[in-house]
């Protein structure tokens, strides 16, 4: 008898499915499980002596659900007991649910071996094999991620690796997520985490894969091409012009209209860099740092952007696999 898949099990005897169920069914089909298991398995404990370790596949699925749904370690343990749909996705039963310490230790294992970057590479390689490879242009941008500013914690102080910055007329405390995005597919290929007070323009060289012939960015990156780290870089810099450079022109003039047309074309290309930010903040609910320190939070951001690539490409993947279910 053919074994039922997660999706089959959820469809059996059901009249209506929740958004979370449909989301998990889609992710079950598009995540490159074999590639991710191969990445992590060499570092995963074999459970020799004492109680056997939980299956790696189960812990990986639990880890991804934490990122998708924003669960803390204790909340993830409770959710596995309380929310029926999560257990079959992870391949777990009520008789043996990993506790919050086990869930924490799995995340620490990934952090120790710096596997978040590997997760992004595996997912992007998988997408590339399915026709979503990187092209020749990169769009760069950054977004602020708030960190808890309260000192009401066991250390009695704010995270020393987070900093304050001003945007517009408002002050923010936290970090920045800087990303490099393919200009055609909109998929993230590079992620850097810094304190919030680090200038965006200083991180561009870390966001390029090196094969670009075009780099696009908003006006906040004005002058990037003059920085020493880009000396000799043969790319076309499509940086948005500051409004002050053409607002003095008559709006009826041919020059003004030409500049506006050029800026509109630039903006249409740059818009793709906003999609991953929207996915991690609105779809995955990531609006505030969840750990202390840049390293741990950056590792989570890399994982989130890797998962955002799968989310943005899911229709392409499901349609090409002939498995899309509505």
Describe each model-derived feature in a short phrase.
Residues 32, 51-57, 95, 265, ...:
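Secondary-structure capping and boundary motifs in well-ordered enzyme cores
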Residues 37-57:
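An N-terminal domain-cap segment
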Residues 58-70:
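Alpha-helical support elements that line or immediately flank enzyme active sites
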Residues 49-51, 70-72, 110-111:
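N-terminal core-binding DNA-recognition domain of tyrosine recombinases/integrases
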Residues 54-59, 79-82:
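Non-catalytic DNA-binding core/recognition domains of DNA-processing enzymes
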Residues 2, 6-7, 74-81, 90, ...:
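Polybasic low-complexity intrinsically disordered regions
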Residues 1-34, 41-42, 319-326:
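Charged, often Cys/His-bearing segments associated with DNA-binding zinc-finger transcription factors
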Residues 4-10, 213-214, 219-295, 299:
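Helix-centered, glycine/charged polyanion-binding patches within enzymatic domains
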């Amino acid at each position: 008898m053919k074994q039922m898949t997660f999706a089959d099990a959820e469809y059996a005897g059901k009249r209506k499915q929740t958004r979370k169920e449909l989301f998990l069914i889609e992710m079950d089909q598009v995540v490159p499980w074999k590639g991710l298991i191969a990445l992590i398995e060499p570092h995963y404990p074999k459970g020799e002596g004492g109680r056997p370790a939980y299956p790696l596949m189960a812990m990986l699925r639990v880890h991804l659900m934490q990122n998708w749904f924003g669960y803390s370690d204790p909340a993830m343990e409770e959710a596995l007991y309380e929310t029926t749909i999560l257990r079959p996705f992870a391949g777990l039963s009520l008789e043996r649910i990993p506790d919050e310490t086990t869930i924490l230790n799995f995340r620490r294992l990934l952090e120790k071996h710096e596997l978040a970057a590997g997760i992004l590479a595996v997912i992007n390689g998988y997408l590339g094999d399915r026709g979503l490879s990187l092209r020749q242009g990169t769009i760069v941008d950054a977004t602020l991620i708030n960190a808890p500013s309260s000192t009401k914690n066991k250390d009695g102080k704010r995270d020393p690796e987070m900093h304050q910055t001003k945007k517009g007329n408002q002050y923010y405390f936290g970090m920045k997520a800087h990303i490099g995005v393919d200009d055609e597919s909109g998929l993230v290929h590079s992620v850097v985490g810094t304190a919030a007070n680090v200038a965006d323009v200083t991180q561009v060289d870390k966001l390029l894969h090196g094969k670009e012939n075009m780099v696009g960015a908003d006006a906040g990156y004005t002058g990037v091409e003059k920085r020493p780290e880009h000396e000799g870089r043969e790319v076309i810099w499509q940086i948005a012009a500051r409004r002050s450079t053409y607002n003095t022109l008559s709006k009826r003039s041919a020059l003004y209209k030409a500049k506006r047309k050029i800026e509109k074309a630039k903006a249409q290309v740059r818009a793709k860099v906003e999609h991953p930010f929207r996915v991690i903040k609105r779809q995955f609910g990531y609006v505030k740092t969840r750990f202390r320190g840049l390293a741990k939070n950056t590792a989570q951001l890399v994982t989130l952007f890797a998962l955002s690539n799968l989310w943005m490409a899911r229709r392409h993947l499901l349609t090409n696999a002939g498995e899309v279910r509505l």
